[in-house]
């Protein structure tokens, strides 16, 4: 939910007022140029002034997941973002990626259902992550079904190639598993 509060930001020369959205965009800009500590500081300022600003929680989740590798804190921020702004599509795939990585079955199922019902979410990525989750669980049939669904949804050429490779990998694992299945006949 976008707020319209203002935050005081001091510079050496003058006091300048920024809206929370402007401060958020500054933080995202800092992060995109590799200035992680400055971006983190700005995001924490936003959260301290407006703890309900969902998109700052999303960016913090990404920082803690991909940069800091603090998965519990990342999960907290992704979950908070999802609760505060459930229609924000960008959050779902990153949160789901974390849950698949941590093998959290119940949350994977719950978040994937919400993601697939949220407009703007990359459904191919959601199905691909579900395929990966089931592949890690060695449930080849469910993995294949989800990778095939991902294939039907994908629009990016490189993502399509990745999904095709995942499907081939699962089929190979299925054949390999069948090769080691023994039948006892009497």
Q: For each of these PLM feature ranges, what is it?
A:
Residues 10-20, 144-186:
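Terminal, low-structured helical/coil segments at or just beyond the last alpha-helical repeat
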Residues 18-49:
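Alpha-helical segment of the N-proximal tetratricopeptide repeat
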Residues 28, 62-63, 97, 132, ...:
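Residue-level recognition of tetratricopeptide repeat
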Residues 32-41, 68-80, 102-114, 139-146, ...:
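Structural signature of tandem alpha-helical TPR/SEL1-like repeats
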Residues 45-48, 79-83, 113-118, 152:
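Conserved structural position within tetratricopeptide repeats
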Residues 51, 86, 120-121, 155:
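Short coil turns that delineate tetratricopeptide repeat
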Residues 56, 91, 126, 159-163:
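TPR alpha-solenoid repeat register
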Residues 59, 94, 129, 163-166:
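Canonical tetratricopeptide repeat
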């Amino acid at each position: 939910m976008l707020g319209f509060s203002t935050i005081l930001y001091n510079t050496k020369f003058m006091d300048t007022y920024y809206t929370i959205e402007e401060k958020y965009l500054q933080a995202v800009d800092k992060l995109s140029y590799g200035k992680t500590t400055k971006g983190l500081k700005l995001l924490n300022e936003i959260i301290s002034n407006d703890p309900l600003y969902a998109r700052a929680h999303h960016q913090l989740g990404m920082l803690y997941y991909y940069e800091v590798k603090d998965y519990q804190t990342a999960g907290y921020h992704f979950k908070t973002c999802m609760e505060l702004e459930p229609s924000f599509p960008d959050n779902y795939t990153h949160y789901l990626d974390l849950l698949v990585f941590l093998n959290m079955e119940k949350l994977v199922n719950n978040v994937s259902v919400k993601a697939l019902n949220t407009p703007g979410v990359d459904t191919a990525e959601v199905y691909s992550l579900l395929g990966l989750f089931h592949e890690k669980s060695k449930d080849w049939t469910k993995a294949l079904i989800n990778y095939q669904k991902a294939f039907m949804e994908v629009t990016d050429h490189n993502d399509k190639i990745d999904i095709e490779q995942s499907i081939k990998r699962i089929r190979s694992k299925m054949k390999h598993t069948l090769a080691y299945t023994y039948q006892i006949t009497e």
